[in-house]
Every structure is written in C-alpha cells, then in structure tokens.
Amino acid sequence: MKVSVLVPAYNCASTIRSTLDSVLQQTDPADEILVMNDGSTDETPLILESYKDRVTLYSQPNRGIANVRNELVARATGDLISFLDSDDLWHPKYLEVQRNLFQEHPEAVAFWAGHINFYGNGEYEWEGESSGTGGTVELIPALDFFTRYNRATGPFSCFSYCCVPRRVFGELGNEPFKEMGAEDSYCCSLLALVGPVVYCSAELVAYRLRKESLSNDHSWTFGRWVHVFELLEERFEETAGPELLSAFQMAFASKRRSYAKLLMGTGKPSEARAQLLQSVHNSANPISIAKSLSMLILTYLPRPLQPSWPTGHRKWKGSENV
C-alpha cells in the first residue's frame, strides 16, 4: 500500500521546516511527499529547495490552498492520501497509525486522528515514547456523521489530521476542495455522501494556533461553516437518501443557530434574526423548528432579559510577541 503526503506551502518560512521534518521523521515513512509552493513571496521557496532531494517540489502563481490541494490530489499516486498544512506537525507514529486504520477498515472513506492545539511559531514537544498511542477507534456511519460533526466540529474540521483513500476522490468530483476559507469543512461534509468515516482519538497531530489566524474568530468560522452548508444543500437534496438529507438539514439549522448566537454577541441582531428565520426553513424537524423560534423570540426581549450571548473570540494563550 502506497501513501502520498500533500503539503501546500504559502509564505510559511517560519514553520515549513518543522512541518516537513515531522513528515520525514515518521516511523512508517510516506512513499511520496508532494509540496506545492503557491506563489510565496518570503523565504519559503529557498527553504523548500533544501528539501528537493527528499520531497517532490512544484510551484505555481498564488491560487489559494483549495486549488493547491486539488492540483496535488490529481498528481498523487498513493492508495491513501494524507494532508498536512504548512504550520502543523505530525507525531512520529501518525502515518503508522493511519496505515493500520486503512487496512483494518477498508470500507471507510476517511480517517481522522485526534489533535492537540499549541500556540505561536515555536516547536511542539511530544511527551515521551508513549505519546500518540492508545485512544479509541470509532467507525462512524454516514447517518451519524452530521450529529457528531455538529456536536464537536473540531475533530473533523482540519485535513492536517485526515487521510482519504485515493479511490474516494473519484466519487467526490474534480474539485473536492473549494476556495472559501472553509475548504476542509466543505470536503469533509462531502465525504458523508460516500460512506462511513473512522475517528481515532489518539492525539497524533499538533495543530498550530497563531494570534493573527482567522480560526481564532469563532464568528468568522461559523459564518464560513454556514456558507459551506449553503453550497452543499442542492447536492444533498439531489443525491442523499431521505435519512441522510434529514441529518444534513438538522445540522444546517443547528449551525445557523450557533452562528446567530455569535452574531448577537457581536452586536448584529438583524443578521442573527435572518439566520434564525432561515434555520426554520432548513429543517422540517419539529424540535429544530421550536429551537429556532424560541431563540428568535429571545432576540426581541429587552437587553437585560436576554441571555449572555457569546462573543466568539478565542482567548489567546500564547506569547504576545508571536
């Protein structure tokens, strides 16, 4: 079985070395590592050149991460395709675990591993030889996927901790990733149309958070997730079975409600109410409708009687200098 690793690289001079080193230090090495320089204007091309004997390098004018991923998927030859962003890090056993999951669950269309957040531009130190081991493994049916995704989006929101069998991309279409600021969530949701996914809770990926990252703004993130559902709605209506479509619609309504809370917390009541009204139309489920209408009523109460709405900004835990 052949494994391909795909790494988009854009203006990542401060992190790309540690990212590529984490790939090259795997206990079960990748068969090919494809790196695309997406029109970087910093020292990234020079750094990548120093790895040319160990990875396959490509370069193009800046077209965005979705385009890069689609290009690299088309060029990959592995049976299992692994993705890694240019600022995240893998535990040395990451590919070893993913290969085993692939062999144990040939019916699965994606394999996610657990991750841990870390802050700034520094390195992440894995704790001891036993780190990255253990955890539970779940096979999540397509019908249950949106329930899990809606309850905790984080485990499925980044492809740095996801591997996908190459055969699956033939079912997803020519452009499984779309440029919108939520490329991972778009492709992730598409996978539910194809089959079950596997989740291994062992923390095998270090996901880097930086102060300037848009992912620190939950309001922006939820807005992107709502947009993903808007783009996918027609495709699910046309191709999903009744039960999967219902699960998708309930998740869509729930994401709108979560987004509405954040809009209220950032002083945008008109936009929040628009989301809640749309959420009523997203799902015919009576409980979902009742939740949306109840929240809509709360937005019209005098401010002292309203709940404490979340503001949506992640509290920064790193150094102020990064």
Residue ranges: model-predicted function:
Residues 60-76, 97:
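Glycine-rich, basic loop-to-helix element that forms the pyrophosphate-binding segment
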Residues 22, 29, 37-46, 63, ...:
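A conserved acidic beta->alpha catalytic loop
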Residues 148-156, 180, 186, 193, ...:
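C-terminal subregions of glycosyltransferases and related glycan-biosynthesis enzymes
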Residues 11-25, 32:
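Short, well-formed alpha-helical segments that are part of the catalytic scaffolds
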Residues 74, 132-225:
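Conserved nucleotide-sugar donor-binding catalytic segment
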Residues 14-17, 40-50, 89, 93:
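Acidic helix N-cap motif at the loop->helix transition within catalytic regions
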Residues 93-129:
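Conserved donor NDP-sugar-binding/catalytic core segment of glycosyltransferases
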Residues 81:
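Short aromatic/hydrophobic "clamp" motif used to bind/position activated sugar donors
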